[in-house]
Design a protein with these regions (language model features):
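RNA pseudouridine synthases
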Residues: 1-227
Length: 227
């Protein structure tokens, strides 16, 4: 693996997660981010034995973008606590079908995950096991039949953005699970563009940014960069 490293120190490793790569080893047997980065660190620093690299947040397999990993157990524990207490910030970009009625807004839903199918559904508030999902969005640009959104998560539920936008009637382009029919090989147009954390040791606020790749459908919108 030759990772795209955004930041590294003794406590953190921040990389750009490639699209269509699982973050951890799974039943598919496909190369995963954690294993690849462990091997890279082991070779880079000539480390004997096992390399610790903790996963503290998740990105769905088809989604790319900023990924923060912990190089020590202490850093992993502190970062996990930040995420649990909603002290981190995460911003995504998405391209959806259609033109939204409002240029900005907040979506509030209640979601329920089916552990057998791993699908997530919008349900009523009083459904047993339902969890509140909140996100804020703004429209960045339009193209014929598509809109680019900037999304800030207020909660971090599985498949949250994908399910909420589909429920709004504007599924993400390329989302084979919750969207419209997609051609084989089409990647989902969802990208984690910003991650904000407090450094687990110094406490300094840190902001990591990366823009989506210049491929379809992102390329249709030109070079719109993050602020």
């Amino acid at each position: 693996m030759n990772p795209d490293v955004l930041y590294e120190d003794n406590h953190l490793l921040v990389v750009v997660k490639p699209r269509n790569m699982p973050i951890m080893a799974d039943d598919s047997g496909d190369p995963d981010l954690q294993s690849g980065l462990k091997a890279w660190l082991k070779e880079k620093y000539d480390k004997p034995g096992n390399v610790f690299l903790g996963i503290v947040h998740r990105l769905d397999r088809p989604v790319g973008g900023v990924m923060v990993l912990a190089k020590t157990s202490k850093a992993a524990s502190r970062l996990s606590a930040q995420i649990r207490d909603q002290e981190t910030g995460k911003v995504y970009r998405a391209i959806v079908h259609g033109v939204l009625e409002n240029t900005s807004g907040r979506l509030r839903d209640f979601l329920l995950k089916d552990d057998q199918t791993r699908n997530v559904s919008r349900v009523s508030q009083n459904t047993p096991g339902a969890k509140e999902a909140l996100l804020d969005y703004e429209v960045m640009a339009h193209q014929p039949g598509m809109s680019m959104l900037r999304i800030r998560l207020q909660t971090g539920r599985p498949h949250q953005i994908r399910v909420q936008l589909a429920g709004l009637g504007h599924p993400i382009v390329g989302d084979a699970r919750y969207g419209r029919n997609t051609e084989p090989g089409t990647s989902i147009a969802l990208w984690c563009s910003i991650m904000e954390i407090d450094h687990p040791v110094t406490g300094a606020r840190m902001r990591f940014v990366c823009d989506p790749p210049a491929i379809w459908p992102w390329s249709v919108f030109g070079s719109i960069r993050e602020r």
